């Protein structure tokens, strides 16, 4: 991997003398800049606009070249607000793409799209930087082995397993436990895999970004006392940012993740919240760049933009980037071009259910709606596959019987159906699990359950060996031995 050392001050001053242009036109976040003949910047070069506005305030706006228009004119997209810019202002061509800090110094810190810290905790070590525009790893570098990425979360590992180096779509409304699930995954990858995480907040609410940061500090994912011990780097380009920043913040987060994979040879979790906002920002910029809109008003380059981001998220022989992407579906229309283009890249989907959350079953992952391409006998093995299928069949039958139970009651069911319902209710409760990051809220210690233990537990429930245990014994426990111990305690309390 190529690492760009930070440009020294003397180099910048010579650049200023060499490649100076002037603003010719400003259309919102898009600028047209005129350069001297033969001094045209390359596509994706970073341009810097320095000057003062009408009230004397210092202006420092970074732009990215998107088009070469001819007649020594380029069109660039601003990464911050263009307020106060005027025609004729000087523009410096830096001669390189946007570069951001990478490595251990980024952990525990919050950055903007330009890689500048925005958490008021002082400067970041910028000796190691990397450009945000890079090619996807060459085919020969890819790790072609299909392997499961064990999360320690029972419902995920059993029914919708994640692929190491894969892409997972996370679907769920507000208040169903998306943030807590994300934090638990960050915690578990650090403890079980010695990996780190990068969180890219793309075009979402600033309040949510702040809440996530506060909760991460509270749960220990970000270590305030020793920042270097933190397990995650945060990159935010929120709703109030111009479209240029929202369009590129995903690449900034990805660049930081690539360094951990390629240089530190670690397993990395990359969270993107929300991938739809990445498309939306591209759509806003596309119209301003004069491109003809495509279906439903989206940019004609939608598939290319999505592909250039997604293809960089992969496993190599050094390490892996496993990406979990929150997907907003506009008007719940799955055929909308934005979510439809995203689905083409996903290996698994994790769907959070409000119904399960209302029952108090956390994580509220819907076992019937969540899917994974990894759940095949040749990948996970016959035992895992058979157990998962039987669990799904039992839950599906319970779902079909719920209307009858609501109208006529349990007594009207056949003996076989009553047994199915009893086991399904135990399975439903056993799919819940106490989280490490929720210890501060619940008071019960978190549990990491290995895949073999998970399969053994569900096999025992399905076989009927535990039919005599009360269903509350299976609620919020780790492995099956804890459920049997809890049942004995409940029995003792009754006496």
UniProtKB/Swiss-Prot annotation:
GO terms for cellular component: chloroplast thylakoid membrane; mitochondrion; proton-transporting ATP synthase complex. Gene3D superfamilies: 2.40.10.170, Bovine Mitochondrial F1-atpase, Atp Synthase Beta Chain, Chain D, domain 3 (1.10.1140.10), P-loop containing nucleotide triphosphate hydrolases (3.40.50.300). GO terms for molecular function: ATP binding; ATP hydrolysis activity; proton-transporting ATP synthase activity, rotational mechanism. Its main location: plastid. It catalyses: ATP + H2O + 4 H(+)(in) = ADP + phosphate + 5 H(+)(out). ATP binds at residues 172-179. It comes from the Eukaryota. InterPro entries: AAA+_ATPase, ATP-synt_VA_C, ATP_synth_F1_bsu, ATPase_a/bsu_AS, ATPase_alpha/beta_chains, ATPase_F1/V1/A1_a/bsu_N, ATPase_F1/V1/A1_a/bsu_N_sf, ATPase_F1/V1/A1_a/bsu_nucl-bd. Its EC number is 7.1.2.2. PROSITE patterns: ATPASE_ALPHA_BETA. Signal peptide: none annotated. Produces ATP from ADP in the presence of a proton gradient across the membrane. The catalytic sites are hosted primarily by the beta subunits. F-type ATPases have 2 components, CF(1) - the catalytic core - and CF(0) - the membrane proton channel. CF(1) has five subunits: alpha(3), beta(3), gamma(1), delta(1), epsilon(1). CF(0) has four main subunits: a(1), b(1), b'(1) and c(9-12). This is ATP synthase subunit beta, chloroplastic.
């Amino acid at each position: 991997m190529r690492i760009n050392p930070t440009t020294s001050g003397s180099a910048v001053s010579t650049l200023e003398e060499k490649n100076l242009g002037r603003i010719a036109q400003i259309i919102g976040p898009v600028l047209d800049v005129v350069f001297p003949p033969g001094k045209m910047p390359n596509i994706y070069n970073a341009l810097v606009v320095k000057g003062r506005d009408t009230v004397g305030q210092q202006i420092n706006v970074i732009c990215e070249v998107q088009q070469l228009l001819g007649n020594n004119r380029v069109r660039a997209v601003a990464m911050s607000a263009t307020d106060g810019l005027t025609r004729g202002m000087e523009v410096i061509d830096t001669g390189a793409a946007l570069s951001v800090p990478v490595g251990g110094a980024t952990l525990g810190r919050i950055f903007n799209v330009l890689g500048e810290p925005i958490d008021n905790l002082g400067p970041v070590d910028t000796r190691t930087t990397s450009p945000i525009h890079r090619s996807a790893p060459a085919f020969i570098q890819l790790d072609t082995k299909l392997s499961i990425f064990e999360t320690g979360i029972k419902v995920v590992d059993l029914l919708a397993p994640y692929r190491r180096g894969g892409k997972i779509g996370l679907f769920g409304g507000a208040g169903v436990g998306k943030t807590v699930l994300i934090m638990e995954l960050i915690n578990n990858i650090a403890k079980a895999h010695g990996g780190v995480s990068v969180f890219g907040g793309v075009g979402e609410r600033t309040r949510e970004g702040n809440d996530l940061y506060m909760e991460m500090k509270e749960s220990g994912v970000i270590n305030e006392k020793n920042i270097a011990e933190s397990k995650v780097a945060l990159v935010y380009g929120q709703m109030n940012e111009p479209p240029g920043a929202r369009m590129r913040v995903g690449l900034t987060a990805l660049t930081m993740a690539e360094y951990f994979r390629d240089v530190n040879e670690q397993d990395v979790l990359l969270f993107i919240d929300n991938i739809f906002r990445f498309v939306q920002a591209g759509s806003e910029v596309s119209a301003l760049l004069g491109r003809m809109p495509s279906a439903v008003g989206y940019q004609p380059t939608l598939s290319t933009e999505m592909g250039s981001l997604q293809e960089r998220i992969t496993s190599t022989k050094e390490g892996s980037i496993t990406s979990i992407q929150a997907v907003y579906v506009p008007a719940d229309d799955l055929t909308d071009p934005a979510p439809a283009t995203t689905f083409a890249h996903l290996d698994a989907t994790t769907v959070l259910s409000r119904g399960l959350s209302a029952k108090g079953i956390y994580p509220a992952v819907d076992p019937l709606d969540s899917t994974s391409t990894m759940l095949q006998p040749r990948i996970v093995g016959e035992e895992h596959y058979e157990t998962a299928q039987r669990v799904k069949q039992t839950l599906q039958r319970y779902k079909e019987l719920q209307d009858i139970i609501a109208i006529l009651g349990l007594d009207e069911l056949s003996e076989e159906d009553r047994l199915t319902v009893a086991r399904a209710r135990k399975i439903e409760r056993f799919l819940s699990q106490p989280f490490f990051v929720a210890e501060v809220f619940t008071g019960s210690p978190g549990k990491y359950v290995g895949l073999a233990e998970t399969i053994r537990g569900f096999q025992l429930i399905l076989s009927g060996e535990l039919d005599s245990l009360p269903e509350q014994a299976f609620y919020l426990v780790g492995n099956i031995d804890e459920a049997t111990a809890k049942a004995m305690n409940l029995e003792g309390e009754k006496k």
